[in-house]
Structures are given as C-alpha cells and as structure tokens.
Amino acid sequence: MTVTIENIHAREIFDSRGNPTVEVDVRLTDGTLGRAAVPSGASTGDREAVELRDGGDRLQGKGVSKAVANVNGEIYEALKGQSPFNQAKLDHLMIELDGTKNKSRLGANAILGVSMAISRAAANSEKIPLYRYLGGVDLELPQPFFNVINGGVHADSGIDVQEFLITPVKRESFRDGLEKIANIYHTLKKILADKGLETAVGDEGGFAPKLGSTENAIATLYQAIESAGYVPGEEIAIAIDPASSEFYDDKEKVYRFEGQKLTSKELLTYYENLVEKYPALISIEDGFSEHDWEGFAAQTKAQGQKIQLVGDDIFVTNPEIFKEGIKKGVANAILIKLNQIGTVTEAIEAISLARKAGYKTMISHRSGETVDSYIADFAVAMHAGQIKTGSMARSERVEKYNQFLRIEEELGKDVALASFPG
C-alpha cells in the first residue's frame, strides 16, 4: 500500500514565554501521526523568515490564527495525497505556494510546522527514530553548549552580553558531559546565592544575576567551574553570545556597550583582550552586528585562527546570505535555527554549504521554546557537531538534553561523540 498524506491539522498552542505558537499534526493513510511545534525568538535577525502573527488586540497581537488557517487550508490542499517520504519536494512545494522570498504570505511558522511534522510522520511510518530517518546510519552526538548566565534581551540582568555558555570539552559520553554541567550549574547557583545575587532564571533557564559586566560574569563562571572540581579550558570551556545587533547604533555606527560608545575597531580590541585574559573562552557568537559585515570580517581575520566565531543574525540560516558571508570571510561557524529559514530542507542546505566551506555548525533552540525535542534528533542526524539549547533548568530546555541521553542509550557505547573544535 502506498502511504500518502491524509490530513494536516494545525492548532494554536503556547510557548515557554506564554506566547502563541503553531503546532501541526500530519496524519498519513497508514494511520501514522507526526506532530511538531514551532519555536520563536526574542533577538531576531532582520532577514529571518517571517513569523506570521495576527496583530490586533487579541493576545497582544501575537496570535497565530492566520498561520494556523494557512496550514489547515492552502497548505493542506496542496500536500494532501502526496508521499511524505520526499521531504525536499514537499518543502519546495510550500515555498512555491507561499511565493515570497521570506515566507511572509503563509508564514514561516506555518510552513516549518508542517515541514517538521511531515518528517516525523515519515519516520514513524517507517518505524524508525527521527534521527535515523533524517541521518541514516552515520550519526554523531553533538558537543552541547549550556547557557548558564542570561543577559541582554533574555533577562533583566543589566549585562549587555546575551548568553554566557559552558561546554564539557572533556567527556567520556554525553551523559558524563551533562553530569559535569549539572554539577557546575548547582555550584554556580550556590555561589550567586552566597553573594546575595539573584538566582531566578531567564528565558533559557540560565541565571540572571546583576553582575555588572561581562568580565564579572566570566570570572564567576571560572569560579563555579573550579569550585565544582574542574579545570577551565581543559575540561570545561566558555562561550559567549553578545547578540551585538541589539546594542549596535545603526545611525552612529557605534556599539553602546557597558556604558561606552565603541567603534568596531575598539570592540574588536575588547574581544581580543577578553580572550587573552580568559583562555577558556573558545567561542564568540554575533560579536558584531548583522549590519556591520566589515567589523565581523575584521574579527574573523584577527581571531578566526584562535577561536570559533559564530554567525547567527548575520546569516539567519539562509543559504543565499550565507554564501555572501563565505565570500567575504565572515565568521568560521554558522548557527542553524530551523525557524530562521522555515523548512527542514533549507536548514540542511545551509549545513551542507558550511561543510563544503570549512565552517563549523551549531544547532540552536530559540528563547521561546516548546517541549518538542526535534532539534536534538536533527543535530544527531546532521552530524552538526554542536548544539545550544539552554541551561539545566526549565523543562523545555532540559527535554532536548534528555533526548540526547535516550539516543545515546539506543545507539550504545559505540556512537560517535563530537569534540570541540572537531
């Protein structure tokens, strides 16, 4: 019996920030169900695929009933009766149906929900795990990065840098690495509490203490790592995501950072000094604004041989924009966010481009998440090498890490473990 798509049904659910988002069910003719929920970002790149919101008074204008209607209407009509096993064909059908460059007519949140749910339905129909369906037999567990201190738009902490992350560069297994991070997380909480600092968590499960500066935050991480019994840089490394587009002044072409106005050159000097002072700092994401390609390229030239430089807002997981970045020598790694581009197929294309150009890849969650663990399977399937999906708190974050534990258990001790820098 040929299995085809029988029904596609979307609904409005709520994400981890209490905002509406899209969930999609794809039902196949063999009775199989695939379900997927779409995340949403707080700091977004200007050229990201468009998340269709309703506007108006209901739910502060953030309702997604239009996107839901597009799934239940046009998209369902276009895809019903199609085979679920040709992901690229179905994704391109939806792209053509939308007819815009940024998926603004139907909504990237509508299209991505269907794209993810189709692949999950196909995997379920084949009775194999999603990671196996997407990746075949060649699989690898990624290097995880944990956002343990939140700043920027993810928290009201007064720190301009948005994320301070730690990663277990020395680990025997995924579980071993996760246990190390759990130890540091609880140690960090105690250190903050002992200093009389806030231990409430931000959007991504990290703490949001008023530490006053980037250096204070990194120094506190060093203290937590050492107090937990590990060696900074050797066993546990540090990464930051300044999300600098958020503090870049487009008119004056300066960065309003920690009470100063910095030129691109001055900000680069700041990063160089930071890496020299804290050698455990091995990765900087979006150190320069998405509108400051020259600054980003200058950083890549100056620091690209020493540390990882990740492009997020500047590339927005868009293969065409990424090609431009490769030509201009911008960054040496790319962040992959499924909802930035809006289909599974295009995200895979961006990863393929990165591989050919010698760029590292890091899969990422969004600050508005759901308990859907799709990106965990996706990271394993794609040999992505790295993932960041929050801290060791908030179930929508921890669920992704728990999925890696399940995958590691299923694949056994022989499963490949990505290393940094890989």
Swiss-Prot record:
Family: Belongs to the enolase family.
Name of the molecule in the record: Enolase 2
Gene Ontology CC: one annotated term: phosphopyruvate hydratase complex
GO BP annotations, alphabetical order: glycolytic process
Active site residues according to the UniProt entry: 204 (proton donor), 337 (proton acceptor)
Classification of source organism: Bacteria, Bacillati, Bacillota, Bacilli, Lactobacillales
Primary gene name: eno2
Binding site for Mg(2+): 241, 285, 312
Keywords: Cytoplasm, Glycolysis, Lyase, Magnesium, Metal-binding, Secreted
